[in-house]
Amino acid sequence: MDYTILGLDGSLRPGTREVFEQLVARGHDVYVWSGMGGVRWDEVRRSGLEPFVKGVYRKPLADFRAGLERCGVPVVPDFVIDDYPEIVAHFGGVRIKEYLSRHQEDEEMYAVLAQIDAHQQPAPEGRGPVLTGE
């Protein structure tokens, strides 16, 4: 959550609301997790993201697969968007640069939809979408 969709100044990263809305419109479930402070629904609500978010959880910071259960995360992510490279490497997804404040030029979220679309292109033999995780 921090530095991925929220800056140090509490601002919402540019494009976050639009990208979440598009993801949900395309049939994706969106979950938010935080390694700093646990479950943070209040910030999700304040940012206007609640209509798009299916759940908010603590983020596992190590031993990621087992950490999902420890942190109460009921799903294994297919695609992770995070500034924390280790968790993206483990589950698959895209690492985006840290977002610090509204004064920062930032277009990271706008590139996320294209990366998700590329990730879900049919396999060469037509076996359906290519997904990371289970």
Where on the chain are the PLM-derived regions?
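Alpha-helical substrate-recognition element adjacent to the catalytic core
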Residues: M1-D63
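C-terminal cap/substrate-recognition subdomain and adjoining C-terminal extension
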Residues: W41-E134
